[in-house]
């Protein structure tokens, strides 16, 4: 799948131009073999997958213009000129396989980060550290690096930090903190659809489930592990980007034994994409369970539930019944087995699939206009569909007469009097589809609730291992309310992430005896405020319009513009300004289209229908809305989708903030789902959306360069070779002397207890000083090198003289003979 022009524009906007090219010595001559990255090249024009090329700077360059020759990917060999503003520093002579932390690179500009990740990815090193993150790139093939042997390798290592980056290393670290400090942990796994979040979560679960002694009771662990196929069946779907896309957020709490193995657990699901239940884009599917059920059900189930073919159901896209690499029949059998392993009995399992059949059947019921009670557009059920409607209600264990009444009859209370009218066709259709969505969502949550009742510890969790599986920032061509909710979630997580990084930096400074006054960072509090602050924010004005008579999407946008235009994080749109608006998110500006915002935010099942469900004679169905407060008639503040989302998100963040977090960022390397294929624009967009570039920027705060004394001496020994080789000085004294000789100002450096701290410009100046020293020695080195070569050659000849003379003697002897 080719890169779109929109993606290319987005990717190029992300690139930060911060490199100060230090290609010249004191006399203005180009350093020999000096390499840079540039985004100017015929290769880039021809191949949209490439954003940068590596070049060598040639003589004839100056401070404004550089003459360069492209070397990677190989070019024509012909020099060409570029503006110095189109050049970035390069990490020359760095082996990406020799270390796994991007933050240790001298240069962490955009092309350097992309190149580092690419080299590792192409050599099947899919895990890289960008402290405190682990970056995981989807290999689209089995690398054999998540086997039981690999689990033992990371679990049993005396020091796992010496092993290469891996999600098992993250799991080991979190587990060590959980048991060593008795503090709850959370592993946050995020990434876009198809990036490998689900697989990463599975493998971490597998690590936690591994036991050293194998003696623990596996009853609860089996139930927890069995939940994965069920959660995927009900919460995952085929999208354009991913055949197994998770369309909900998941937070798990696990109690893990000191010896390994999961003792207890709990699952919270949120942000389920309900719109997918009733409609899907071309080449996409609804949730897997529908297709698994229709294909995998035996003849008895098909007869009992009146099942038809996939193309016979209006709620299912008829164009994508099958998916490459997915066996729906086999997966259905796995779901049945998993439901049983979750301790659901046969009757409960039958009710689950009866409800699913009922949802599909209700979707086929046509709502039409009829003339009733003097109204020409009154809603009615098509005469030919009455039996279908009754069958749907029967399958969902609901009274058809009561449901019919609530779908068609509109009741209002005026002055204490009850007035009955009729819903119009559109209103009744919305109510019907809301019932379909509500039944599915509540069924999904009931399955999870039932699981939790069997696996949660008595008395609750003391210290737990949390796992959050969540999408990263979403930026589409058309961004709606779903994207707004997802991006609000990510802003909350971003605040948590920045606070953690800042806290860790502050601790390092304190431990090394360095003042934290140099640490300054930008908070995203203003963005969060403009999005969801009580009373004056995007969500509060949306709720106002949902509750106001005559509220509309346009009035909502206008209210935002009038009240928020002075806030720099809210930007009125220039095109279609009556329905579009822009939020200046952490990752950049995102434009939202307000079409159907009010409709989606009011997508709450009416209290009268909820009451019918609660009154069902079936225990499973009556339990779907158990505990929910019924509000009949008018909607109230707090009952809307946005309010429910914020309450749930606030609770989730409170829980996460009480833990020690660990971060795994999953990257999708290409849209073709092929191994060893690298698409730079798409990857860069993800690096930005997942705050990976932001993490590297945060590492640059204050004294961004930090190395142990020995590491510093190894890197900069040629600044003053006499000092670095002076055996009478200890490592700290050597570092101190080299820094004084370099002439760096005091505000550029600090020497801690075990480390050297330098500001970014200070590290660059030191690198330049070392290059100039090496240039000064170049002629001397060449003479010494030639003398050594001559000596070695002479010594080699002398060592072989006797042998050569013997060979000559043998040859002469044969010639004489």
UniProtKB/Swiss-Prot annotation:
Q: Which GO terms describe its cellular component?
A: cytoplasm; myosin complex; plasma membrane
Alphabetically, the GO molecular function entries are: actin filament binding; ATP binding; microfilament motor activity
Domains as described in the record: This protein differs from the typical myosin heavy chain structure in having head and tail domains but no discernible neck domain.
Q: Keyword check for Phosphoprotein, yes or no.
A: yes
Which Gene3D superfamilies does the entry mention? 1.10.10.820, 1.20.5.4820, 1.20.58.530, Kinesin motor domain, Myosin VI head, motor domain, U50 subdomain
Q: How does it assemble?
A: Interacts with ACT1.
Q: Residue ranges of the Myosin motor domain?
A: 97-771
Region annotation (Tail) ranges: 773-817
Compartments (UniProt record) = Cell membrane
GO biological process per UniProt = actin filament organization
Q: Which residues does the record give as ATP binding sites?
A: 191-198
Summarize the protein's role: Myosins are actin-based motor molecules with ATPase activity. Unconventional myosins serve in intracellular movements. Their highly divergent tails are presumed to bind to membranous compartments, which would be moved relative to actin filaments.
Give one Pfam hit by family name: Myosin_head
Report which superkingdom the organism of origin falls in. Eukaryota
Q: Where is this region: Actin-binding?
A: 661-671
The text of the family note is: Belongs to the TRAFAC class myosin-kinesin ATPase superfamily. Myosin family.
For the modification Phosphoserine, the affected residues are 19
Does the keyword Cell membrane feature in the UniProt annotation? Answer: yes
Please provide the record's keywords in A-Z order.
Actin-binding, ATP-binding, Cell membrane, Membrane, Motor protein, Myosin, Nucleotide-binding, Phosphoprotein
**Can you name this protein?**
Myosin-A
Topology relative to the membrane: Peripheral membrane protein
């Amino acid at each position: 799948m080719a890169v779109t022009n929109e993606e290319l524009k987005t990717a190029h906007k992300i690139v930060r131009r911060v490199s100060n090219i230090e290609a010249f010595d004191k006399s203005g001559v180009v350093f020999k073999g000096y390499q840079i990255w540039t985004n100017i090249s015929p290769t880039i024009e021809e191949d949209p997958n490439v954003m940068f090329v590596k070049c060598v700077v040639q003589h004839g360059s100056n401070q404004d213009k550089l003459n360069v020759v492209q070397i990677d990917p190989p070019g024509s060999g012909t020099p060409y000129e570029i503006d110095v503003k189109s050049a970035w520093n390069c990490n020359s002579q760095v082996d990406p396989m020799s270390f796994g932390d991007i933050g240790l690179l001298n240069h962490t500009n955009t092309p350097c980060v992309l190149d580092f990740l690419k080299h590792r990815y192409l050599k099947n090193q899919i895990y890289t550290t960008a402290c405190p993150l682990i970056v995981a790139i989807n290999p689209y093939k089995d690398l054999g690096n998540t086997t039981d042997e690999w689990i033992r390798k990371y679990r049993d290592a005396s020091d796992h930090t010496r092993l290469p980056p891996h999600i098992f290393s993250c799991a080991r670290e979190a587990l060590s903190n959980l048991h060593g400090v008795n503090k709850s942990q959370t592993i946050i796994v995020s990434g876009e659809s198809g990036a490998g979040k689900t697989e990463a979560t599975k493998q971490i679960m597998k690590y936690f489930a591994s036991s050293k002694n194998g003696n623990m009771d596996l009853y609860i662990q089996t139930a927890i592990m069995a939940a994965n196929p069920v959660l995927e069946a009900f919460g995952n779907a085929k999208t354009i980007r991913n055949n197994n896309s998770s369309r909900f957020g998941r937070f798990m709490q696990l109690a893990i034994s000191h010896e390994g193995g999961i003792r207890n657990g709990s699952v919270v699901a949120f942000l389920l994409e309900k719109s997918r239940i009733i409609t899907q884009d071309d080449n996409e599917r609804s949730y897997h369970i529908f297709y698994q059920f229709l294909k995998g059900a035996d003849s008895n189930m098909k007869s009992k539930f009146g099942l038809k073919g996939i193309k016979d159901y209006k709620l299912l896209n008829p164009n994508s019944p099958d998916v490459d690499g997915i066996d729906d029949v086999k997966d259905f059998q796995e779901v049945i087995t998993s439901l049983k392993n979750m301790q659901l009995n046969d009757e409960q399992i039958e009710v689950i699939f009866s409800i699913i059949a009922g949802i599909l059947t209700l979707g086929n019921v046509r709502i039409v206009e009829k003339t009733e009670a003097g109204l020409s557009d009154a809603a009615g059920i098509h005469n030919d569909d009455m039996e279908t409607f009754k069958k749907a209600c029967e399958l969902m264990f609901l009274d058809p007469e009561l449901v019919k009444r609530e779908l068609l009859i509109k009741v209002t209370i005026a002055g204490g009097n009850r007035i009955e009218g009729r819903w119009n066709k559109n209103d009744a259709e919305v109510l019907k589809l809301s019932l379909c969505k509500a039944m599915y969502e509540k069924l999904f949550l009931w399955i999870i609730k039932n699981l939790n009742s069997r696996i949660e510890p008595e008395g609750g969790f003391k210290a737990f291992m949390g796992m959050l599986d969540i999408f990263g920032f979403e930026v589409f061509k058309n961004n709606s309310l779903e994207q707004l909710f997802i991006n609000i979630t990510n802003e909350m997580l971003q605040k948590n992430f920045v606070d953690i990084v800042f806290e860790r930096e502050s601790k390092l400074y304190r431990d090394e005896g360095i003042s934290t006054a140099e640490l300054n960072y930008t908070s995203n509090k203003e963005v969060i405020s403009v999005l969801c602050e009580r009373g004056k924010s995007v969500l509060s004005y949306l709720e106002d319009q949902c509750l106001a008579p005559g509220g509309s999407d346009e009035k909502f946008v206008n209210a935002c513009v009038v009240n928020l235009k002075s806030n720099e994080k809210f930007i009125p749109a220039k095109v279609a300004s009556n329905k579009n608006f822009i939020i200046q998110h952490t990752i950049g500006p995102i434009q939202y289209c307000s079409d159907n915002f009010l409709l989606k935010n009011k997508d709450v099942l009416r209290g009268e229908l909820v009451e019918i469900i609660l009154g069902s004679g079936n225990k499973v169905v009556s339990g779907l809305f158990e505990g929910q407060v019924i509000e009949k008639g008018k909607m109230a503040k707090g009952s809307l989708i946005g309010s429910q989302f914020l309450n749930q998100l606030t609770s989730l963040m409170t829980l996460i903030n009480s833990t020690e977090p660990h971060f795994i960022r999953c990257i999708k390397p290409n849209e073709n789902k092929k191994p060893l294929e690298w698409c730079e624009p798409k990857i860069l967009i993800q690096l930005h959306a997942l705050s990976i570039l932001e993490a590297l920027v945060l590492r640059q705060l204050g004294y961004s360069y930090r190395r142990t004394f020995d590491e510093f001496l190894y890197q900069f020994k040629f600044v003053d070779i006499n000092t670095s080789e002076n055996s009478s000085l200890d490592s700290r004294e050597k570092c101190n002397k080299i820094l004084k000789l370099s002439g760096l100002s005091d505000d550029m450096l600090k020497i801690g207890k075990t480390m050297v701290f330098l500001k970014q410009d200070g590290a660059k100046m030191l690198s330049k000083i070392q290059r100039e020293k090496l240039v000064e020695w170049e002629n001397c080195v060449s003479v010494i090198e030639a003398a050594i070569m001559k000596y070695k050659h002479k010594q080699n000849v002398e060592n072989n003289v006797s042998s050569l003379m013997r060979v000559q003697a043998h040859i002469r002897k044969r010639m004489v003979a």
